Amino acid sequence: MKLSTKLCWCGIKGRLRPQKQQQLHNTNLQMTELKKQKTAEQKTRPQNVGIKGIQIYIPTQCVNQSELEKFDGVSQGKYTIGLGQTNMSFVNDREDIYSMSLTVLSKLIKSYNIDTNKIGRLEVGTETLIDKSKSVKSVLMQLFGENTDVEGIDTLNACYGGTNALFNSLNWIESNAWDGRDAIVVCGDIAIYDKGAARPTGGAGTVAMWIGPDAPIVFDSVRASYMEHAYDFYKPDFTSEYPYVDGHFSLTCYVKALDQVYKSYSKKAISKGLVSDPAGSDALNVLKYFDYNVFHVPTCKLVTKSYGRLLYNDFRANPQLFPEVDAELATRDYDESLTDKNIEKTFVNVAKPFHKERVAQSLIVPTNTGNMYTASVYAAFASLLNYVGSDDLQGKRVGLFSYGSGLAASLYSCKIVGDVQHIIKELDITNKLAKRITETPKDYEAAIELRENAHLKKNFKPQGSIEHLQSGVYYLTNIDDKFRRSYDVKK
């Protein structure tokens, strides 16, 4: 009989053969080394991941909404009171999403003295498409010198793309693929509409965020999303910059998405033991959990209504929270409640004193710029920082609601854990708003017409003025016969 060479035991004492003893010893050493490596990795995992810096680009031209009301022949207050808008930013054919993204990113890099070699991810959120193949991110790589090892591309879903780019960046830093470098998120759009009721809800602007560990603004581990197929707002016509919009349906989609992400976020936060006194199993009690709330801002009036809607969610879970309100409203059919004007009006009034202290500061930029689409919620967040101030924000939690038609929505939150005065200084929002040129409605219409004429053109030189542009702003100079775009920087 042949003895197997694989036998590892011999003798009555069951001793291991020397070869097997050595193999076992080596295995133990390897396991010990792996444990050491794992312990070391745990010690070096990034902590306090969040926003280290923010920059915002607000175009230097705007139109006053009161003047636009007169120009459009609508009733006084339709745009200013009905929509809650004061001014609307716009650009002519000299600026596009490439130039506006280059402008805000270059300003972020310069204002925070960022070493671009230490950036390992750059992602862009936008719905303002110039090319169906080439990404905005690839254009921005011109600012990174010899650093070509940079992950990330563009992400698209209406106004939600900036948030998805942010989540991707946070996930990358917290993953095993992280190489120790920081990330940058760029988001923004040019929001314009065809003539009609939606035109005053436009706007323009870009935001860039520097993301990394040891940040003064740290994102919480809880977030919730709601995704659904809906034709509330979409852009199927590539021959035009204008969207197709089902206005009333889109408002309902926004409110429904807010309800759903609030319920999901509440359940997750409660299950993690983060909520001390919830309103119910799926309502965490907004007024006790969040110190401030920031929203995607199609219009400021919608945000005012939406904050009241959050309180209504708590009321449905526990009517005793607001004993002054008729308890019968808590039992209304849910679908009917989405468009119930009595509920809406009641909770706008209930929320009014809290809105003044916790939301209004975030709306100063949006009411003066209009909708920046993907940058909207982050422009509102920048507004909150600027008009509340670093001292009053210390230790405070901010809830953020991001919405993109089609639809995609998320509720997430961050906490201010360090001094943000330097961020407020670099944002320089008050001066940026003050230095703008307020154009006439005719000037606004002329700028939109220039954009219409420039759309999809090649062998084209833009006709718009650059006199209003400030130093450091990128602008379009030429589109050649192969649609390749050239830019310059205003001196």
UniProtKB/Swiss-Prot annotation:
Name the gene that codes for it. Answer: ERG13
- Broad class of enzyme this protein falls into: transferase
Q: Which family does it belong to?
A: Belongs to the thiolase-like superfamily. HMG-CoA synthase family.
Its BP terms in the Gene Ontology are: acetyl-CoA metabolic process; ergosterol biosynthetic process; farnesyl diphosphate biosynthetic process, mevalonate pathway
Give residues annotated as binding (3S)-3-hydroxy-3-methylglutaryl-CoA: 159, 201, 250, 296, 305, 371, 405
Q: Give the catalytic activity.
A: acetoacetyl-CoA + acetyl-CoA + H2O = (3S)-3-hydroxy-3-methylglutaryl-CoA + CoA + H(+)
Q: What happens when the gene is disrupted?
A: Drastically increases HMG2 half-life.
Q: Does the keyword Phosphoprotein apply?
A: yes
What's in the misc comment field?
Present with 34800 molecules/cell in log phase SD medium.
**Pfam families for this protein:** HMG_CoA_synt_C (PF08540), HMG_CoA_synt_N (PF01154)
User: What GO molecular function annotations does the UniProt record carry, in alphabetical order?
Assistant: hydroxymethylglutaryl-CoA synthase activity
- This protein's pathway: Metabolic intermediate biosynthesis; (R)-mevalonate biosynthesis; (R)-mevalonate from acetyl-CoA: step 2/3
Name of the protein described by the UniProt record: Hydroxymethylglutaryl-CoA synthase
Q: Does the keyword Lipid metabolism apply?
A: yes
List residues, modification Phosphoserine. 276
Enzyme Commission code(s) on record: 2.3.3.10
Instruction: Identify the species of origin.
Output: Saccharomyces cerevisiae (strain ATCC 204508 / S288c)
* Active-site residues (renumbered): 127 (proton donor/acceptor), 159 (acyl-thioester intermediate), 296 (proton donor/acceptor)
Q: Which UniProt keywords apply?
A: Lipid biosynthesis, Lipid metabolism, Phosphoprotein, Steroid biosynthesis, Steroid metabolism, Sterol biosynthesis, Sterol metabolism, Transferase
Query: What cellular-component terms does GO give this entry?
Result: mitochondrion; nucleus
Q: Function, please?
A: Hydroxymethylglutaryl-CoA synthase; part of the first module of ergosterol biosynthesis pathway that includes the early steps of the pathway, conserved across all eukaryotes, and which results in the formation of mevalonate from acetyl-coenzyme A (acetyl-CoA). ERG13 condenses acetyl-CoA with acetoacetyl-CoA to form hydroxymethylglutaryl-CoA (HMG-CoA). The first module starts with the action of the cytosolic acetyl-CoA acetyltransferase ERG10 that catalyzes the formation of acetoacetyl-CoA.
Q: What SUPFAM superfamilies does the database record attribute to this sequence?
A: Thiolase-like (SSF53901)
